[in-house]
Amino acid sequence: MTPIAQSALPRIIRTPWQIRWQPELIGTLVFLIHQGQVLLIEKLTGHGQGKINGPGGKWEINESLLECARRETLEETGLAVDNLTCEAELRFVEQAGPQWLGYVFVAKVFSGELTQTQEAKPFWCDLGNIPYRFMWADDAIWLPKVLKQAQQSSSRPQPFVHNFLFNDGELLAHEPVSQTQLSFSVTQPRAAQFVRQS
């Protein structure tokens, strides 16, 4: 596992279950909306294999979260996305595994040809028929809010923050966060490696 950047890491992220929580892995998810549908993938390998989700993956050194979102979408679907907006920060406090921090983006502009890859089988899904039973348990909590925000054409709402508590992949509890400031800038590149503080 690649450690995260010290220069961008908040000293303390407070969650209801850990006062000094720090993510070990940071990643992105992208939901491309087009003509009343959203692009989803069936994950064929790696973390979340067999589950349905948006394209996404781990944030790498020297790229911004926006660049990560674009790269992962291209790698997993063959589509180049543009005009991404960050809609949410998700904090996954895991009692029996790695700690994840996720950033959810929405795009409405894309180019290219939809292509299945070794990592993912992409498909379009009606916005009113999302297969939550084949997704992570938390997706049904935050994804409807993301999609609703993304379809508002007037003023853009601030990204929301939500905490989730898991034990070995089982969702135990969740809580929205009143703050709207994200823990990381979505436009700043990830810098030097960071050794996680205990």
Predicted segments, located by residue:
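Short helix-capping/linker segments at secondary-structure and domain boundaries
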Residues: 148-160
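Active-site segment of metal-dependent pyrophosphate-handling enzymes
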Residues: 78-113, 127-129
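Conserved Nudix-box catalytic region and its N-terminal flanking loop in Nudix hydrolases
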Residues: 37-75, 89, 172-180, 186-198
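NUDIX/MutT-family hydrolases
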Residues: 106, 115-146, 167-185
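Acidic, metal-coordinating catalytic segment for phosphate/diphosphate chemistry
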Residues: 2-29
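A cytosolic small-molecule/anion-sensing beta-strand core signal
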Residues: 34
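Conserved beta-strand and immediately adjacent loop positions that scaffold enzyme active sites
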Residues: 29, 37, 121
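Conserved anchor residues at repeat-unit boundaries in beta-strand-based tandem repeats, strongest
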Residues: 160-168
